[in-house]
């Protein structure tokens, strides 16, 4: 159909789809890898470790470049090798021993099918936002329950709070139950919304980045909570208060659920 015969919304949608089509065509050239049962684990580990590494490097550089400490929420804290290595080891162990068998079973039952067409850009952005909002609500409820019910906290969530001052590689330092719960929320949301595979990949990248940033311990001028207006997004300062006080800020990203239930706690952090 000629563009002269298209309505404005159709033209806009087509433009959005054309914008992402080259990227999707490139990814589809790796179709064998994307459809492999190994891909979810490889993708998850490499994305997570890749996002953590810059913060690990910054923590090391803080010893030689004291000016970097002005961006740290806890300027006198830097994780030691004895703290970093168990976190990394547990992430690798859990993905190999627990996540991979589940993805293998899912692959055997329903292999991934890759459509030829890319998603429309606006639809991709809408789906990512909705997935984040759904995940934020689901984890808020899960998190609140695992703090309010002592048995749930001791059995499943306490391990995540072993490090009172958080750092990037501590993001996934958690029990297998917590890891699977978060993974289940991720996959349920993209399935409920019928997300395109490219949208699903993008959402996972965004979700991993936001969770690592929340635990990084660094409050930069470009941190997400500084970019989102009106205090809608909590960010690293918001989550650090949770690790410090335990009884507040249960939502991972946004602040509305904590505001509604009266569990929001804020801190005045000077601009850097």
Swiss-Prot record:
Annotated Fatty acid hydroxylase domain ranges read: 129-263
UniProt xrefs under InterPro entries: Fatty_acid_hydroxylase, Sterol_Desaturase_Related
Q: Which ranges belong to the motif Histidine box-2? A: 157-161
Pfam families assigned: FA_hydroxylase
The protein's UniProt keywords, in alphabetical order, are:
Endoplasmic reticulum, Glycoprotein, Iron, Lipid biosynthesis, Lipid metabolism, Membrane, Metal-binding, Monooxygenase, Oxidoreductase, Steroid biosynthesis, Steroid metabolism, Sterol biosynthesis, Sterol metabolism, Transmembrane, Transmembrane helix
Topology with regard to the membrane? Multi-pass membrane protein
According to its UniProt entry, the function of this protein is described as: Catalyzes the formation of 25-hydroxycholesterol from cholesterol, leading to repress cholesterol biosynthetic enzymes. Plays a key role in cell positioning and movement in lymphoid tissues: 25-hydroxycholesterol is an intermediate in biosynthesis of 7-alpha,25-dihydroxycholesterol (7-alpha,25-OHC), an oxysterol that acts as a ligand for the G protein-coupled receptor GPR183/EBI2, a chemotactic receptor for a number of lymphoid cells.
Protein name, entry field: Cholesterol 25-hydroxylase
Upper lineage? Eukaryota, Metazoa, Chordata, Craniata, Vertebrata
């Amino acid at each position: 159909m000629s563009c002269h015969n298209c309505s404005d919304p159709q033209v806009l949608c087509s433009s959005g789809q054309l914008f992402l089509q080259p990227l999707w065509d490139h990814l589809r050239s790796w179709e064998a890898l994307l459809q492999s049962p190994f891909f979810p684990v490889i993708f998850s580990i490499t994305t997570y470790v890749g996002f953590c590494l810059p913060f690990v490097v910054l923590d090391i550089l803080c010893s030689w470049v004291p000016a970097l400490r002005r961006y740290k929420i806890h300027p006198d804290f830097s994780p030691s090798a004895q703290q970093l290595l168990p976190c990394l080891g547990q992430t690798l162990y859990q993905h190999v021993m627990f996540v991979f068998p589940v993805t293998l079973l899912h692959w055997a039952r329903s292999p991934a099918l890759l459509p030829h067409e890319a998603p429309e850009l606006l639809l991709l952005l809408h789906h990512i936002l909705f997935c984040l909002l759904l995940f934020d609500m689901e984890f808020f409820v899960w998190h609140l329950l695992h703090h309010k019910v002592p048995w749930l906290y001791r059995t499943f969530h306490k391990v995540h709070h072993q490090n009172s001052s958080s750092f990037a590689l501590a993001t996934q330092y958690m029990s297998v139950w917590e890891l699977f719960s978060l993974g289940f929320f991720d996959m349920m949301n993209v399935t409920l919304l019928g997300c395109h595979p490219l949208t699903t990949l993008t959402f996972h990248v965004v979700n991993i980045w936001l969770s690592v940033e929340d635990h990084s311990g660094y409050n930069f001028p470009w941190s997400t909570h500084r970019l989102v207006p009106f205090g809608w997004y909590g960010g690293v300062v918001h989550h650090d208060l949770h690790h410090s006080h335990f009884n507040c800020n249960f939502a991972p990203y946004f602040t509305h659920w904590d505001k509604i239930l009266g569990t929001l706690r804020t801190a005045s952090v000077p601009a850097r």
